[in-house]
C-alpha cells in the first residue's frame, strides 16, 4: 500500500492534522495510520551551513579571508535536532512512501523549512502542498482534498532562499569585517543594522529636540468649530483673534453628505504587533509567539501573514 508522508512544522500541528485525519498510531517521531505517515520538523531543522563548512581558512575571523562567497551552498542539520532529521530522512526514503506533503505553515518561512529538509535528505519523490490558514478540522480536510503540486510554490521558495542567502552573506561578511576592524564582536545584519540606525536617528532627534511655544486661534460657532494653523508669534495670534472678535462669521456654503464608514479590517501580523505593544507593552516577538500558540490551539487563523482578509472557508468556521 502506497503511503503519503505529511511533514508539519511542529509536533503540535502534526498532532492536530493527525486528529483531523483520524490517524492515531503514535511511533517514535511520527504518527502512522490510514495511509498516512505524519511527522514534523521542530522549526528550522536544517539551515545554511556556517562559513567554516566551506574551508578551514574561514574558521578564524581574518580580513584577508573576506569576502566569503560560496559557489555551491551547503546545508547543516541543527545538532540538537539530528534525531528528528534522521527520522524524516528515513521516512522519505521508505519504499512504501509515494509522495511527500509539505504541511508546514502557509508562508515563505514554512516553505523554506520544508524545502531545506527535503533537499538535505536527498528526497526526489513528488511533492504536494497543503495550504491552509486555519487548524479547524474542516479546513484541514478541505486542504487535503485539494492538495497543490509542490512545484507551484517554487517561486515562494526562491524568495525565501534569496532572503536566507542575503542574511548569510551580509551577516557573515559584514560582522567579520567590522569585528576585525573594531577589535570586538560587532554584529551586523541585513535587518538589525538598518533598524538600529532608525533607533539611533530617533534617539538623536529626541536628544536635540527644542521646545517651541505656538498658538492656535479657535472659533466656536455655535455647534461648528474652526481653528487656525500653528502661529509662532504671540502678537500675530492676538491680532488674528482680535480681528475675528470684531467681525461676524457668515456661512457662505453648506454641503450635507451621507458617508458610510467601513468597519476596520482584520489584523495582519504587523498591525496586531503594533496594537499589542500599544495596549499591553508586548514586544513584536512576544505577540508573534502568543499568536502562533493560539493558532495551534485553533483560536486564531494563521498569524504570520500580511493579509487582512479571510478565505471563504475560514469565514464559515469563524
Specify the residue positions occupied by each region the protein language model found.
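Amphipathic alpha-helical segments of the small helical/lid subdomains adjacent to P-loop NTPase cores
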Residues: 159-189
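Conserved ATP-binding/catalytic motifs of P-loop helicase motor domains
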Residues: 126, 196, 300
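Intrinsically disordered, low-complexity regulatory segments
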Residues: 1-164, 168
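Short, basic-rich loop-to-helix N-cap that marks the start of a DNA-contacting helix
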Residues: 311-314
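Short, Lys/Arg-rich nucleic-acid/phosphate-binding segment
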Residues: 304-308
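A short, conserved structural fragment
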Residues: 296-303
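Conserved small/polar residues in nucleotide/adenosyl-binding loops
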Residues: 316-318
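Long, highly charged, low-complexity internal segments
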Residues: 37, 45-78, 90, 183-292, ...
